[in-house]
């Protein structure tokens, strides 16, 4: 399975100590160089702990950096470089999944994938956690704890209503 990630899900999962969950679902994740810079380079310069967590998974070979080859596809600059590169890398590598949280980037990715006939599906941080619960990587209690941890981090740009929806969805299931 080929999985490409943007910065957002990596940073969010690192902030709640859930990067191991990502690699419980996928053996490796591909990222463009711009995402490594956004998550590790910029993060280390700012001294944020989540950058060290992402760097540790990169050093362990779980996060593979793959260059985006030149593309005929022009993407608007309304989304950031990591998101644009993630979309292009997903097309280039015929990815099964693109992990991205930003709504504009998700909408653009859906449009581009449809136009290009790509079968790449899109999932964000919440989708990763719910899938981890669904597949048994996380227990219900662990999933709920991680979802609630997202609420405690206002710097993670996930809408509170979406987090609450995910909490309700997981809480409704019995183990």
Task: Walk through the language-model features, giving the residues of each.
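Feature 3881 marks metal-assisted phosphotransfer/nuclease machinery
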Residues: 1-2, 13-14, 18-28, 37, ...
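Ordered, amphipathic secondary-structure segments that act as subunit-interaction surfaces
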Residues: 61-101
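A positional/architectural concept
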Residues: 2-69, 76
